[in-house]
Amino acid sequence: MKENKKINFVMPANYDHASGGYKIVYQYANWLDDQGFDVSICYGYAPNDSKLYAALKRIVDMRIFKFSKRKTNLTWFKLNPKIKSYYNCVFSKDIPDSDVVFATAATTAYFVNGLPEEKGEKFYFIQGYEAEGFGNKKGFVENTYNLGMTNIVISNELKSKVLDSGSAEPKYLPNFYNHNEFYLENPIKDRQNMICLLNHTQETKRTKFGLEILREVKKTIPNLEVQLFGAYEPFEKLEDWIHFTKNANTEQLRKDIYGASKIYLMPSVLEGWALTAMEAMASGAAVVSSHIGGIVDYANDSNSILIEPDNKAEFVNAIMNLLQNDEQRIAVATKGSEDVKQYVIDKSGERLLKIINSEI
């Protein structure tokens, strides 16, 4: 594909909240722009609604009474200046013509699939299993895998989900992290008894379960401190040893959260690709995680501690063992920080171009 080709990413609505899935798309957009491609990003208004209903809602929302939290700007991530953004798209005329167009979520799949030919060759970038827990009806996400677009998955578990739906084998495109943002700034060895945990409203992230685990650990490790972080306010009153940072920037994450913690706890039961755990590894935190498909593409028993998702006692014991055995913690954290270095955007970006060009 020549450098002047046009590539368009179609996203769900923009609420200007930090999101791992959005961040991956934005990083690909910047990388493609750096390679000389003409890149645009389109945000749907309500891509799951009928076009007439979505158009009526948009008119009311944008011109009469602002009732939604949709935004027409992006403040938490810096896109390259040449990348064009289109907000609150409803009709195909709202979407620029391109050579390649990506659906980036289940809610955008039908919309992209229905675009006319001049909008580009259609690819479906599948970053997570967006089933009933994401507000979709049973079978909806499986149907999106069978629309006929070229499916791209970021993990082997998602590959299995797509195959189980009856679709053809998807293209595998592993994720990456930004090595300029996350690296070993603070020594692994000299850290306080601090653990970090993501605060999230999505039930599959299981923030509440994570806090229950940490409160059990606190009974045995009285000087335990917790760094809770996320884009949403905590859903419960927190003890004074649990510190919350809202919308932490990358420097705060690298220095004060991941980089100051001995352990990153990830009790999630569903991940497309666990970006936060990878960032934590790169910053020197030992990862204690649920043994789920979204992490095992890069995590194993030598560079992390993987626990059966509902075994609370095992989570507690694993964390206490690491806090009480510095040699083991340092070994796990060091191995993790080394192992994730292979996941770079240049490698993933080149693979993406090969997928677009039908070379793999």
Where in the sequence are the language-model features?
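Conserved donor-binding/catalytic core segment of Leloir-type glycosyltransferases
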Residues: 8, 152-153, 187-205, 211-218
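Acidic anion/phosphate-binding donor-loop and adjacent secondary structure
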Residues: 131-137, 164, 171-191
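Nucleotide-activated donor-binding/catalytic signature segment of Leloir-type glycosyltransferases, i.e.
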Residues: 232-255
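Short acidic/histidine- and often glycine-rich active-site loop of Leloir-type glycosyltransferases
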Residues: 237, 292-306
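Aromatic "clamp/platform" in nucleotide-sugar-dependent glycosyltransferases that forms part
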Residues: 269
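Short hydrophobic beta-strand element within catalytic cores of glycosyltransferases
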Residues: 286-289
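Conserved acidic donor-binding segment of nucleotide-sugar-dependent glycosyltransferases
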Residues: 301, 305-312, 321-326
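A short, well-ordered alpha-helix in the C-terminal region of glycosyltransferases
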Residues: 314, 321, 328-342, 351-354
